[in-house]
């Protein structure tokens, strides 16, 4: 039987594609070695003998890992020989990677295959508890796990950050473009988490005092989290609190959302003010204790409150009358009644 020309052409193209793909893989592997040689990239392990109580990392472009382990070590892969420095000065372990001297093609190159120069990686293993750990990274992911520190500070420009199983007195994390995860950790003092563009996830974490969150563009989700009080500000993105518990009954909390929804589920909040311009506010089996306000510009309110009707005094600023100041738990809902609908139910 005579084979059709289009079948022959298809098989030929498939065969040619396979050859090109194999060639690309080989070329990529060669590129990896070529770039390492041309850029003087090295692998290096350091174990400074001097004692230190703080760690300072200033990295331009690398994947950074700081982890707990039984033995102190610093390992680096694919770092420029003349731009990578490790030293102990003034009781501080200093790790620096400066990419100013690297040519543009150390980050990308032209070609038909998707291979790039080898990525720099720095891994720091810390066996003890330290006074302060500060990490600054221009471009690259950052993972911090299992360490014990008094003050932890993370500042990223481009990349995702994960902080897991960490014990700290205070935590500050600032990420310009990338996601931020905080999980399975204990912060006895204040946790300040700020993002410009990215999603924030906090789960299975205890925060002793203030939980401060700011996000310009991205969603924020806190699950199984406790804190003393809260201060959260979102410009564009939704806020979801699930099994979220505030423990300080004397402090006030503030939630400000410009464009996004707020949803609370199985949570407990004290003396909270919610200010939403564009978005809906809803709760499921959530306790709003103390004096609370919900200010809406454009959006609806659906409250399912934990407890009985008699546990709360719910009022509306656009309705006749006012709240009884002697009531234990007050909720004042304000907004334009022509654009805001409010419903309130109870679990008992």
Model regions: which residues?
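Intrinsically disordered, low-complexity terminal regions
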Residues: 1-348
């Amino acid at each position: 039987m005579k084979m059709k020309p289009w079948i022959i052409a298809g098989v030929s193209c498939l065969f040619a594609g396979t050859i090109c793909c194999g060639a690309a893989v080989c070329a990529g592997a060669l590129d990896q070695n070529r770039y390492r040689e041309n850029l003087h990239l090295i692998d290096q392990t350091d174990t400074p003998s001097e004692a230190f109580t703080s760690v300072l990392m200033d990295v331009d472009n690398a994947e950074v890992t700081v982890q707990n382990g039984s033995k102190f070590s610093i390992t680096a892969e694919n770092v420029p020989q003349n731009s990578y420095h490790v030293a102990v000065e003034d009781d501080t372990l200093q790790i620096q990677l400066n990419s100013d001297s690297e040519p543009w093609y150390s980050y990308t190159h032209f070609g038909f295959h998707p291979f790039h120069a080898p990525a720099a990686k720095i891994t720091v293993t810390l066996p003890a508890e330290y006074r302060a750990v500060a990490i600054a990274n221009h471009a690259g992911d950052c993972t911090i796990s299992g360490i014990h520190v008094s003050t932890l500070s993370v500042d990223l420009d481009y990349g995702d950050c994960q902080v897991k199983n960490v014990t700290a007195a205070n935590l500050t994390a600032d990420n310009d473009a990338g996601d931020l995860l905080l999980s399975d950790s204990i912060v006895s003092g204040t946790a300040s988490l700020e993002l410009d563009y990215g999603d924030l996830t906090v789960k299975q974490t205890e925060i002793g005092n203030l939980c401060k969150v700011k996000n310009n563009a991205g969603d924020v989700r806190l699950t199984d989290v406790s804190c003393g009080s809260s201060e959260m500000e979102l410009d564009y993105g939704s806020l979801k609190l699930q099994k979220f518990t505030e423990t300080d009954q004397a402090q006030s909390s503030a939630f400000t959302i410009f464009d996004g929804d707020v949803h609370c589920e199985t949570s407990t909040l004290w003396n909270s003010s919610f200010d939403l311009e564009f978005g809906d506010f809803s709760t499921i089996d959530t306790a709003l204790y103390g004096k609370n306000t919900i200010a809406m510009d454009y959006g609806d309110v659906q409250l399912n409150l934990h407890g009985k009707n008699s546990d709360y005094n719910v009022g509306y600023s656009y309705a006749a009358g006012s709240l009884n100041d002697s009531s234990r738990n007050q909720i004042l809902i304000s907004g334009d009644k022509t654009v805001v609908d409010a419903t309130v139910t109870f679990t008992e």
